[in-house]
């Protein structure tokens, strides 16, 4: 009696690499963070309306926002593919390596952006869809080209960067509110310590690509450090507005004071230390600030949401 051994099913070659390419194209990690901050806005929108904190509307909102965000990131990589090829940290992107064609990237981008906006309009409301598209337009048509022209690009980019919680809020509420403005302001001011620390760490890469971030234009580091301290100082009182608007309580108030003071202290250290490019401390303090900023924001929002539920 003979038996035939059936071959094991194996994944189709190229599927895993294609998924990795899509992840790189849509900046999956950044898109995930955007969805999480949008969730914060949706959370407080639901709490304000007396709606369930978990609902199908929330699902539709986060999915639509994620699609628009991922599509915008993909179009950014389409536009900046030549600059990306000149930077070590972005040279692995699929449009640079050739593992994905330019046409493929453009189609994915447009389908996600337009489809995501349409999905938001149909499943939540058209205000959110319009704001999402406006955010994409400002990011792609103002921030992206300005990166090659003037350091003000960081300020312009902070506007679309602060929109996710506003989108989450309007998706649930259907209109704007002071709570959404407060969340927008927190995210707006937080971006300066965060992105200036990144720009300082990768200033040589940016210089090679012709991207005129502040650390590239002002090589001594004083202007960068000064701007970091100023925005960190403004951020501290701004984070207290949720308490003043009474959508967060005393636990949040104390946490905002502690977290804000710690971020300001790290920012101040970067200002007081020697940040000359040749200094051995140059990247050390920028890296510490980057770590502090990426720890600060999720902790702040988590405490804000937790305080609302207890």
UniProtKB/Swiss-Prot annotation:
Cross-referenced InterPro entries: Protohaem_IX_farnesylTrfase, UbiA_prenyltransferase, UbiA_sf
Membrane-crossing residue ranges in chain numbering: 30-47, 50-70, 102-122, 126-146, 152-172, 181-201, 228-248, 251-271, 286-306
One of the GO BP terms on file: heme O biosynthetic process
Localisation per UniProt entry: Cell inner membrane
GO CC term, one of those recorded: plasma membrane
Organism superkingdom: Bacteria
Keyword Repeat on entry: no
Disulphide connectivity of cysteines: none
Catalytic reaction(s) noted: heme b + (2E,6E)-farnesyl diphosphate + H2O = Fe(II)-heme o + diphosphate
Pfam families linked: UbiA
Pathway info: Porphyrin-containing compound metabolism; heme O biosynthesis; heme O from protoheme: step 1/1
Gene Ontology molecular-function annotations: protoheme IX farnesyltransferase activity
E.C. number(s) listed in UniProt: 2.5.1.141
UniProt keyword annotations, A-Z: Cell inner membrane, Cell membrane, Heme biosynthesis, Membrane, Transferase, Transmembrane, Transmembrane helix
Functional note: Converts heme B (protoheme IX) to heme O by substitution of the vinyl group on carbon 2 of heme B porphyrin ring with a hydroxyethyl farnesyl side group.
Family classification: Belongs to the UbiA prenyltransferase family. Protoheme IX farnesyltransferase subfamily.
Protein name (Swiss-Prot/TrEMBL): Protoheme IX farnesyltransferase
Native organism: Koribacter versatilis (strain Ellin345)
């Amino acid at each position: 009696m003979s038996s035939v051994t059936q071959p094991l099913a194996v994944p189709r070659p190229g599927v895993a690499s294609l998924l990795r390419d899509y992840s790189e194209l849509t900046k999956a990690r950044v898109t995930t963070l955007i969805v999480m901050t949008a969730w914060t806005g949706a959370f407080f929108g639901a709490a304000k309306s007396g709606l369930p904190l978990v609902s199908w509307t929330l699902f539709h909102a986060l999915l639509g926002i994620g699609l628009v965000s991922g599509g915008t990131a993909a179009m950014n990589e389409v536009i900046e593919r030549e600059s990306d090829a000149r930077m070590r940290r972005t040279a692995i992107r699929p449009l640079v390596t050739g593992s994905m064609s330019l046409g493929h990237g453009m189609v994915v981008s447009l389908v996600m952006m337009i489809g995501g906006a349409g999905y938001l309009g149909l499943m939540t409301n058209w205000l959110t869809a319009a704001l999402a598209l406006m955010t994409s337009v400002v990011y792609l048509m103002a921030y992206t080209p300005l990166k090659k022209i003037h350091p003000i690009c960081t300020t312009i980019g902070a506007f679309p960067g602060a929109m996710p919680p506003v989108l989450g809020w309007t998706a649930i509420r259907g209109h704007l509110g002071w709570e959404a403005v407060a969340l927008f302001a927190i995210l707006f001011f937080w971006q300066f310590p965060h992105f200036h620390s990144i720009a300082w760490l990768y200033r040589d890469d940016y210089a090679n690509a012709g991207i005129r971030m502040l650390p590239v234009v002002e090589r001594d580091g004083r202007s960068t450090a000064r701007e970091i301290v100023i925005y960190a100082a403004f951020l501290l009182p701004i984070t207290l507005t949720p308490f003043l608007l009474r959508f967060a309580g005393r636990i949040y108030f104390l946490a905002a004071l502690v977290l804000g003071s710690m971020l300001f202290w790290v920012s101040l250290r970067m200002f007081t230390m020697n940040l000359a490019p040749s200094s051995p401390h140059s990247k050390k303090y920028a890296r510490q600030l980057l770590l502090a900023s990426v720890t600060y924001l999720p902790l702040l929002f988590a405490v804000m949401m937790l305080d609302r539920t207890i």
